[in-house]
Protein backbone atom coordinates (compact mmCIF):
# COMPACT_ATOMS: atom_id res chain seq x y z
CA UNK A 1 0.00 0.00 0.00
CA UNK A 2 1.44 3.33 -1.05
CA UNK A 3 1.34 6.26 1.33
CA UNK A 4 0.26 9.68 0.11
CA UNK A 5 3.89 10.86 0.33
CA UNK A 6 5.02 7.93 -1.82
CA UNK A 7 2.31 8.66 -4.39
CA UNK A 8 3.49 12.26 -4.58
CA UNK A 9 7.11 11.13 -5.01
CA UNK A 10 6.10 8.78 -7.82
CA UNK A 11 4.17 11.53 -9.60
CA UNK A 12 6.97 14.06 -9.12
CA UNK A 13 9.59 11.70 -10.56
CA UNK A 14 7.26 10.72 -13.39
CA UNK A 15 7.31 14.32 -14.59
CA UNK A 16 11.02 13.78 -15.30
CA UNK A 17 10.25 10.64 -17.31
CA UNK A 18 7.85 12.48 -19.60
CA UNK A 19 9.50 13.29 -22.89
CA UNK A 20 11.89 10.36 -22.46
CA UNK A 21 9.43 7.45 -22.49
CA UNK A 22 10.86 5.81 -25.60
CA UNK A 23 14.47 6.15 -24.41
CA UNK A 24 13.79 4.92 -20.87
CA UNK A 25 11.61 2.05 -22.09
CA UNK A 26 14.11 0.90 -24.71
CA UNK A 27 16.95 1.07 -22.21
CA UNK A 28 14.97 -0.96 -19.66
CA UNK A 29 14.15 -3.61 -22.28
CA UNK A 30 17.76 -3.78 -23.49
CA UNK A 31 18.94 -4.20 -19.90
CA UNK A 32 16.39 -6.95 -19.32
CA UNK A 33 17.43 -8.81 -22.48
CA UNK A 34 21.10 -8.54 -21.49
CA UNK A 35 20.78 -9.44 -17.81
CA UNK A 36 17.97 -11.97 -18.24
CA UNK A 37 18.50 -13.47 -21.73
CA UNK A 38 15.64 -15.94 -21.29
CA UNK A 39 13.24 -13.00 -21.66
CA UNK A 40 14.19 -12.76 -25.34
CA UNK A 41 12.01 -15.82 -26.04
CA UNK A 42 8.91 -13.63 -25.90
CA UNK A 43 10.23 -11.46 -28.73
CA UNK A 44 11.31 -13.93 -31.46
CA UNK A 45 10.26 -11.56 -34.24
CA UNK A 46 12.08 -8.51 -32.82
CA UNK A 47 15.41 -7.10 -33.90
CA UNK A 48 17.06 -7.21 -30.46
CA UNK A 49 20.10 -5.14 -31.39
CA UNK A 50 20.91 -1.93 -29.53
CA UNK A 51 18.61 0.94 -30.47
CA UNK A 52 16.40 -1.16 -32.78
CA UNK A 53 13.18 0.50 -33.83
CA UNK A 54 11.14 -2.46 -32.52
CA UNK A 55 12.66 -2.23 -29.05
CA UNK A 56 12.22 1.54 -28.99
CA UNK A 57 8.57 1.21 -30.04
CA UNK A 58 7.80 -1.50 -27.49
CA UNK A 59 9.71 0.39 -24.80
CA UNK A 60 7.52 3.42 -25.43
CA UNK A 61 4.39 1.24 -25.10
CA UNK A 62 5.65 -0.18 -21.80
CA UNK A 63 6.42 3.24 -20.33
CA UNK A 64 3.13 4.65 -21.63
CA UNK A 65 1.30 1.87 -19.76
CA UNK A 66 3.29 2.75 -16.64
CA UNK A 67 2.24 6.36 -17.16
CA UNK A 68 -1.40 5.25 -17.16
CA UNK A 69 -0.70 3.39 -13.92
CA UNK A 70 0.90 6.49 -12.39
CA UNK A 71 -2.16 8.57 -13.31
CA UNK A 72 -4.53 5.95 -11.86
CA UNK A 73 -2.57 4.57 -8.90
CA UNK A 74 -5.71 4.15 -6.85
CA UNK A 75 -7.35 1.94 -9.48
CA UNK A 76 -4.58 -0.20 -10.96
CA UNK A 77 -6.74 -3.28 -11.53
CA UNK A 78 -9.17 -1.47 -13.82
CA UNK A 79 -6.43 0.57 -15.47
CA UNK A 80 -4.29 -2.46 -16.33
CA UNK A 81 -7.06 -5.04 -16.85
CA UNK A 82 -6.78 -5.12 -20.64
CA UNK A 83 -3.00 -5.38 -20.48
CA UNK A 84 -3.25 -8.15 -17.90
CA UNK A 85 -5.63 -10.09 -20.17
CA UNK A 86 -3.30 -9.68 -23.14
CA UNK A 87 -0.25 -10.95 -21.29
CA UNK A 88 -2.05 -13.80 -19.51
CA UNK A 89 -4.32 -15.17 -22.22
CA UNK A 90 -2.80 -14.17 -25.55
CA UNK A 91 0.93 -13.74 -25.02
CA UNK A 92 1.20 -16.15 -22.07
CA UNK A 93 4.11 -14.27 -20.53
CA UNK A 94 5.52 -15.80 -17.35
CA UNK A 95 4.59 -13.25 -14.65
CA UNK A 96 8.10 -13.32 -13.18
CA UNK A 97 9.14 -11.26 -16.19
CA UNK A 98 7.12 -8.28 -14.94
CA UNK A 99 9.35 -8.19 -11.87
CA UNK A 100 12.49 -8.47 -13.98
CA UNK A 101 11.46 -5.57 -16.18
CA UNK A 102 10.45 -3.56 -13.12
CA UNK A 103 13.92 -4.00 -11.68
CA UNK A 104 15.54 -2.93 -14.95
CA UNK A 105 13.29 0.12 -15.13
CA UNK A 106 14.37 1.13 -11.63
CA UNK A 107 18.01 0.86 -12.71
CA UNK A 108 17.24 3.15 -15.65
CA UNK A 109 15.55 5.65 -13.34
CA UNK A 110 18.53 5.61 -11.00
CA UNK A 111 20.99 6.05 -13.85
CA UNK A 112 19.16 9.02 -15.31
CA UNK A 113 18.00 10.74 -12.14
CA UNK A 114 21.25 10.45 -10.23
CA UNK A 115 21.00 12.09 -6.81
CA UNK A 116 17.30 12.71 -7.32
CA UNK A 117 16.76 8.94 -7.15
CA UNK A 118 16.88 8.97 -3.37
CA UNK A 119 16.29 5.93 -1.16
CA UNK A 120 12.76 7.26 -0.55
CA UNK A 121 12.09 7.45 -4.29
CA UNK A 122 13.49 3.96 -4.74
CA UNK A 123 11.22 2.55 -2.03
CA UNK A 124 8.19 4.29 -3.53
CA UNK A 125 8.93 3.03 -7.04
CA UNK A 126 9.73 -0.45 -5.77
CA UNK A 127 6.34 -0.63 -4.05
CA UNK A 128 4.54 0.91 -7.02
CA UNK A 129 6.13 -1.40 -9.60
CA UNK A 130 5.50 -4.42 -7.35
CA UNK A 131 1.82 -3.42 -7.28
CA UNK A 132 1.79 -3.04 -11.07
CA UNK A 133 3.44 -6.47 -11.46
CA UNK A 134 0.91 -8.04 -9.09
CA UNK A 135 -2.01 -6.57 -11.03
CA UNK A 136 -0.56 -7.76 -14.33
CA UNK A 137 -0.26 -11.25 -12.84
CA UNK A 138 -3.83 -11.30 -11.43
CA UNK A 139 -5.34 -13.08 -14.42
CA UNK A 140 -2.92 -15.98 -14.06
CA UNK A 141 -4.68 -17.22 -10.93
Curated annotation (Swiss-Prot):
<keyword id="KW-0561">Oxygen transport</keyword>
<feature type="binding site" description="distal binding residue">
    <location>
        <position position="58"/>
    </location>
    <ligand>
        <name>heme b</name>
    </ligand>
</feature>
<protein>
    <recommendedName>
        <fullName>Hemoglobin subunit alpha-D</fullName>
    </recommendedName>
</protein>
<keyword id="KW-0813">Transport</keyword>
<dbReference type="GO" id="GO:0046872">
    <property type="term" value="F:metal ion binding"/>
</dbReference>
<dbReference type="GO" id="GO:0031838">
    <property type="term" value="C:haptoglobin-hemoglobin complex"/>
</dbReference>
<dbReference type="GO" id="GO:0004601">
    <property type="term" value="F:peroxidase activity"/>
</dbReference>
<dbReference type="GO" id="GO:0042744">
    <property type="term" value="P:hydrogen peroxide catabolic process"/>
</dbReference>
<feature type="binding site" description="proximal binding residue">
    <location>
        <position position="87"/>
    </location>
    <ligand>
        <name>heme b</name>
    </ligand>
</feature>
<keyword id="KW-0479">Metal-binding</keyword>
<feature type="domain" description="Globin">
    <location>
        <begin position="1"/>
        <end position="141"/>
    </location>
</feature>
<dbReference type="GO" id="GO:0005833">
    <property type="term" value="C:hemoglobin complex"/>
</dbReference>
<dbReference type="GO" id="GO:0005344">
    <property type="term" value="F:oxygen carrier activity"/>
</dbReference>
<dbReference type="InterPro" id="IPR050056">
    <property type="entry name" value="Hemoglobin_oxygen_transport"/>
</dbReference>
<dbReference type="InterPro" id="IPR000971">
    <property type="entry name" value="Globin"/>
</dbReference>
<dbReference type="InterPro" id="IPR002338">
    <property type="entry name" value="Hemoglobin_a-typ"/>
</dbReference>
<dbReference type="GO" id="GO:0031720">
    <property type="term" value="F:haptoglobin binding"/>
</dbReference>
<dbReference type="GO" id="GO:0019825">
    <property type="term" value="F:oxygen binding"/>
</dbReference>
<dbReference type="GO" id="GO:0020037">
    <property type="term" value="F:heme binding"/>
</dbReference>
<keyword id="KW-0349">Heme</keyword>
<comment type="similarity">
    <text>Belongs to the globin family.</text>
</comment>
<dbReference type="InterPro" id="IPR012292">
    <property type="entry name" value="Globin/Proto"/>
</dbReference>
<keyword id="KW-0408">Iron</keyword>
<dbReference type="InterPro" id="IPR009050">
    <property type="entry name" value="Globin-like_sf"/>
</dbReference>
<dbReference type="GO" id="GO:0043177">
    <property type="term" value="F:organic acid binding"/>
</dbReference>
<comment type="function">
    <text>Involved in oxygen transport from the lung to the various peripheral tissues.</text>
</comment>
<dbReference type="Pfam" id="PF00042">
    <property type="entry name" value="Globin"/>
</dbReference>
<comment type="subunit">
    <text>Heterotetramer of two alpha-D chains and two beta chains.</text>
</comment>
<dbReference type="GO" id="GO:0072562">
    <property type="term" value="C:blood microparticle"/>
</dbReference>
Amino acid sequence: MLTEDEKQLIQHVWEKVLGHQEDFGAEALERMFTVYPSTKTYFPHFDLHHDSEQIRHHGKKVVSALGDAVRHMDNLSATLSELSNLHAYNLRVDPVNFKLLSHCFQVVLGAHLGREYTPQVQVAYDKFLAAVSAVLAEKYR
